């Protein structure tokens, strides 16, 4: 036996044996944690992959193929006007009702296209944090003070975090953007800006309305939109198809076949609209992979993002589910520990709320009922705001993917800035309104 050559395989084998030997199977909390991890993964796959992640992957792929890199550099690059760059990045979340994981393909798309780290991280934070529906729900259920504080804090946070990231990594980012500019010196705008704008608006419309949540009150505008969500989504899909035929040389007969398949699914299974949506995604993928060079490049880019992000997200969801469980359920960490640690308005309570929020996974809009339960269990208002500001923008799955895009150092800095600023905001809010 060659110890130098075989010590690593031997170590892995020994480690695996020890883990298997001492595996706490039969301990109720461990068994429950395994089930919670699998339940959360199932819930994530059913509620977020088809309608959230896959459309986001297609948008990210389109950004890298169809969006002019010079346009990205002009509006979001390191040398862009700060007012424009951070203004666009910080309020983008008011349009996108996405969670911390769905925003990742979009962030990866603009970052790789040459967006400066400041505007890119401002968008990364604001995407899930500045959600109009979530802010309205926060004000309605948790109180107007928390709702306003969340809205103002999220906008300010995104700008400040972006500026600090630019300040810390500005020199290295200049080298990256110069390299990007050099590789795109012959970049030409193939289509007018208004065509590109309408094209992306149609895809964003599909993403927004396919994920429109059911409101608590069965009346009013939000409920009307919810009752028509799939009709509206279908309208945006038809609009996208017409633009692809007119401007992107996609064959009309291929899109008509996909449309017939989707319509048949919707008519045959009216109570399961997700099946029709899935049929549309599959058909659309076939259209792209059998189309011209531009269409194939779009799908290749989309698939590239999926290969990078999917495994890390699923692994992160499993770990988060095992440690913390689903909302209303427990994993390895008892919920009593969490609720007892966030009472009052001490520095430690706010810090713990920020860290716990950063590692927990919140699906879109779920943070409000979770916080409602924690406030009822004695959580202070300061820690509640800290969790609201840190939670939706970060999660364990989200962190794993960000590291693969930006690197370890930038990811740790981004997470630290979010946690520290959320903690400070929580302390200040608790002192004023606690």
Stretches found by the model and what they are:
Residues 1-8, 139, 143-195, 241, ...:
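Juxtamembrane and boundary regions of transmembrane helices in multi-pass small-molecule transporters
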Residues 10-11, 50-54, 83-87, 121, ...:
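Hydrophobic alpha-helical transmembrane segments
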Residues 16-29, 206-211:
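Alpha-helical transmembrane segments of multi-pass membrane proteins
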Residues 34-80, 310-317, 321-343:
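Helix-loop-helix hairpins and the membrane-proximal interhelical loops
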Residues 41, 45-52, 58, 80-95, ...:
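Small-residue-enriched transmembrane helix starts and helix-helix packing motifs
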Residues 60, 64, 96, 157-162, ...:
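Alpha-helical transmembrane segments of multipass membrane proteins
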Residues 69, 80-82, 93-151, 321-406, ...:
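Membrane-interfacial helix-loop connectors
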Residues 76, 205, 210-364:
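Transmembrane helical segments that form the transport core of multi-pass membrane transport proteins
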């Amino acid at each position: 036996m060659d110890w130098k050559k075989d010590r690593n395989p031997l170590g892995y084998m020994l480690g695996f044996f020890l883990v298997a030997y001492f595996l706490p199977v039969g301990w109720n909390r461990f068994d429950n944690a395994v089930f919670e991890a699998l339940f959360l993964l199932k819930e994530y796959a059913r509620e977020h992959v088809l309608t959230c992640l896959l459309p986001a992957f297609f948008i990210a792929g389109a950004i890298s193929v169809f969006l002019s890199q010079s346009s990205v550099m002009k509006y979001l690059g390191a040398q862009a006007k700060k007012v424009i760059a951070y203004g666009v990045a910080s309020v983008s979340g008011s349009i996108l009702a996405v969670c911390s994981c769905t925003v990742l393909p979009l962030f990866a798309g603009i970052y790789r296209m040459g967006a400066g780290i400041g505007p890119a991280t401002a968008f990364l934070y604001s995407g899930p944090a500045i959600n109009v529906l979530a802010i309205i729900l926060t004000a309605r259920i948790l109180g107007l003070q928390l709702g306003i504080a969340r809205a103002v804090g999220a906008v300010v946070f995104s700008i400040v975090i972006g500026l600090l990231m630019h300040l810390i990594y500005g020199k290295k980012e200049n080298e990256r953007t110069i390299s990007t500019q050099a590789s795109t010196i012959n970049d030409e705008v193939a289509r007018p800006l208004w065509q590109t704008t309408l094209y992306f608006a149609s895809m964003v419309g599909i993403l927004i309305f396919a994920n429109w949540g059911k409101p608590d009150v069965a009346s009013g505008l939000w409920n009307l939109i919810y009752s028509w969500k799939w009709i509206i989504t279908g309208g945006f899909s038809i609009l996208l198809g017409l633009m692809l035929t007119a401007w992107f040389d996609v064959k009309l007969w291929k899109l008509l076949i996909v449309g017939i398949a989707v319509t048949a699914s919707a008519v045959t299974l009216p109570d399961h609209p997700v099946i029709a949506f899935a049929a549309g995604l599959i058909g659309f993928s076939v259209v792209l992979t059998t189309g011209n060079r531009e269409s194939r490049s779009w799908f290749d880019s989309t698939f590239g993002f999926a290969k990078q992000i999917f495994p890390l997200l699923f692994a992160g969801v499993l770990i988060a589910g095992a440690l913390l469980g689903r909302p209303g359920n427990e994993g390895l960490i008892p919920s009593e520990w969490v609720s007892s640690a966030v009472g009052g308005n001490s520095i430690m309570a706010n810090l713990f709320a920020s860290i716990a929020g950063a590692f927990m996974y919140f699906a879109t809009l779920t943070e409000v009922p979770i916080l409602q339960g924690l406030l009822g269990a004695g959580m202070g208002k300061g820690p509640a705001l800290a969790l609201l500001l840190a939670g939706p923008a970060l999660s364990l799955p989200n962190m794993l993917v960000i590291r693969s895009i930006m690197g370890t150092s930038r990811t740790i800095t981004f997470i630290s800035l979010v946690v520290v600023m959320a903690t400070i905001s929580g302390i200040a809010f608790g002192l004023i309104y606690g």
